[in-house]
Amino acid sequence: MKSNSVVADIVANQRKLERKRWFVILSFLAIGVVSLILDVMTGPAMLSVSEVVNALFGIGEVDKMTDNIVYNLRLPMALMALVVGATLAVGGAEIQTLLNNPMASPYTLGLAAAAGFGASIVIAFGSFGLPVQVAVPIGAFVMTMLASGILFLFASKRRFSSEMLVLVGIALLFIFQSLLSLVQFISAPEVSQQILFWLFGSLNKATWQSLIIIIVVTTICVALLSKELWKLTALRLGEDRAASLGINLQVLRIKVLVLVAMMTATAISFVGVIGFIGLVAPHVARMLLGEDQRFFLPGAMLVGAAFLSLSSVLSKVIIPGALFPVGIVTSFIGVPFFFWIILNNKRGQ
C-alpha cells in the first residue's frame, strides 16, 4: 500500500509539473501573438488594434493604404522577427546542450562573425554580377557554412572534447572579426558604413520570399532535431552517462552542429547579426521549463520569438520614424543578462 502511495505521489507531481510547463509554453505563445500585433501596429503611421485585426483577418472594409502597410511593409517584418527569434533560440539551446556550456551560442562560436565577413566582402568588392540583395545573403551564408565546416572537422575527431570545440569557436570568432575589421579598414567610408549597418542587424530587409526560405529551413531542421530529443536530454546528465546509454556522441555532435549551422546561416544571411537571442532565450526556457527537451525546445523557440518581436517594437518607438537597428536593442537587453549568467556561475562554483 505504501509503495502504491509513493507511485501515486510521483505520478501526481509529474502531472503537476507538466501542467506548469504547458502553462509557461502557452503564456509565451500568447506573448508572441500580442507582440506580433503590436509590431504591425507600430511605425511612422500608427495603426489601431482594430485596423490591424481587420486587415489581418479580412473583417469589414479596410482601405487600400492600411492594407498595403500591413501586408507589404509591416507583416513580413513582424513575422520575420518571430521566425528569426525562434531560429536563433533553437540554435543557442542545442549548442548549449551539446557543449554543456551556458555561454555557448552560434554567436560565440564565430558563426555570426563569419556571416559578417562574408557579407562585407560582397558589399565592399561587388556582387559578382548578382543583385546586391541576393549576393549579400549568399556571401553571408557561404562564409557561415565555411566556419561551420571547420567546427565539423574538429567535432569529427574522436578525442576532441566539448571544451576544446568551444575554444575553436572562440578562435574562429576572433579570426573572422579581424578579417571583417580589415575589410572595413580598406573600404571607402560610405562602404564601411553600409557594412556597419548590416552588422547591426535589421528586420527592414524582410521580404515574403526570404521569410518563406527561413521558415522552410527552420522547419526541416527542427523536425530532424526532434528525433534526437531523448539523446539531447540524456546528454545533460553528462557525456559519460550518455555514452553508457548507447548514444554515439560523435555522430550526435556532428548532426546537431550541421542542423544548427544551417538554421543560423540562413537566418543571419537575411537579417544580419542579431546577438544574444541564442544566449538569453535558452536560459529563460531552461529556468522555467527544465532540461526535458520535449518542453525545452518549443519553449526556447517561443521565448526567442517573443524576445525578438518585442525588441522589434522597442526599436520602432526609441526614435519614432527612424530605422533603429533591432540588433542594438537585443544587445542592450542581452549584455546585462550575460553578466548575470557569469555572476550566477561564479556563485555556483
Give the positions of each predicted feature.
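Alpha-helical transmembrane segments in inner-membrane proteins
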Residues: 1-349
